[in-house]
Design a protein with these regions (language model features):
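Exported/extracytosolic protein signature
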Residues: 1-183
Length: 183
């Protein structure tokens, strides 16, 4: 007989097929298939599909104010695999990274690498085999290169080397700081 390996099979995990032979007189036998252990059924890896978003906690910050970005991604295919996911975000002119503000949020596996160097944020995740959302968060200060009323577009790149990379972006429009009036 033939079988179809269905959606419940996990890529890379062996499936053991057991049969029961019972003549209702003698004790039943339970032969295991495959008989030769070197021939287990191992489902092929099903490719995952990547989706990513980027948000900011304040789209109209004052000049000199700190804001927080969140870059999130997930695999949208049940039992699919994203091999290695790399998030990069080159901060545009007008934004300065806040030291030690970079964190990851979400279930295991956590990023194997989470760094900031010269205004570039990088997070590397190992193989992702579920559909749970994972995120990185970091703060920036709207610096003196930003101009009030001019939009700053911050774009990230989320790549798993198989699917076309996602490039989520979010604009902010800095505003003049409130200056106290002297009475």
């Amino acid at each position: 007989f033939k079988v179809i390996v269905n959606e419940e099979a996990k890529a890379g995990e062996t499936i053991l097929n057991k049969a029961k032979v019972d003549d209702t007189v003698n004790p039943p036998e339970e032969p295991e298939v495959p008989i030769t252990p070197e021939e287990p059924i191992t489902p092929r890896v099903k490719e995952g599909k990547l989706t990513a978003t980027k948000t900011v906690n304040n789209a109209k910050p004052k000049l000199g104010e700190a804001i927080e970005y969140t870059i999130s991604f997930r695999n949208t295919i049940e039992n699919g695999v994203l091999n290695k996911v790399v998030i990069t975000d080159q901060l545009p002119k007008g934004l300065t990274y806040v030291k030690d503000s970079l964190t990851s949020v979400g279930d295991e596996p956590k990023p194997t690498s989470l760094t900031e160097a010269n205004g570039t944020i990088t997070a590397e995740y190992p193989s992702i085999t579920d559909t749970k959302e994972r995120s990185i968060r970091f703060k920036v200060i709207v610096n003196e290169e930003a101009k009030a009323g001019e939009t700053i577009l911050n774009k990230a790149k989320v790549d798993d080397t198989v699917n076309p990379p996602e490039e989520p972006e979010v604009p902010i429009t800095p505003e003049e700081p409130i200056t106290p009036r002297v009475k």
